[in-house]
Amino acid sequence: QRIGTSDPAEVERFVRGELEAKRPVFGFGHAVLRTEDPRASAQFALGEEICPDDEYFRIIRVLREIAPMVLSENPKISNPNANVDIASGTLLNFVGLQDAEYYTTFFGWARVAGIGAQIVDERTVMRGGKGIPIYRPKYIAEEQTLRHLE
C-alpha cells in the first residue's frame, strides 16, 4: 500500500528511499536461503492464477523484479531475493482478509501446524522417538525411510 503504483520507476524510487532512510525492505532476504524462497515462488504462482490483475499483486510482481537488483548493489546484503513475506499479505487481502492486524496471528498459527506435524513425526518415527533438529521437508535424511501418510 505504501508504494501505491506498479510503475517500475516508482517502485525503484521507493526501494532506494527505504534504503536511504535505513528502513528494511520487507519481503526480501532469508537467514538460510540464498535464492528466492520456494514459498514465495509458490505464492506468486497462486497470485498469477487468482489475482493477476489486482493492483497490489501487480505492485509486488514489479517489486519482486526491481528490489533484488537494487538490494544487491549493497555488498552487505547477501540475499536480496524474495522471501515468503512478499506476497502473503497481498494474497490474504485479495481473498478477503483485509485487516492487516490479523496477519501476524494468522502466520503464527500456520507455523504452529507445521511445528506440530514435525513434533508428531519425530516423536513417533524419527530416531526411535528421540527427536531430531528442525529439518526441511523438501529434503530426505539419509537414514529416513520414505513413507506416506494415508
Descriptions of predicted regions:
Residues 1-150:
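Non-transmembrane, aqueous-exposed alpha-helical and coiled segments at domain scale
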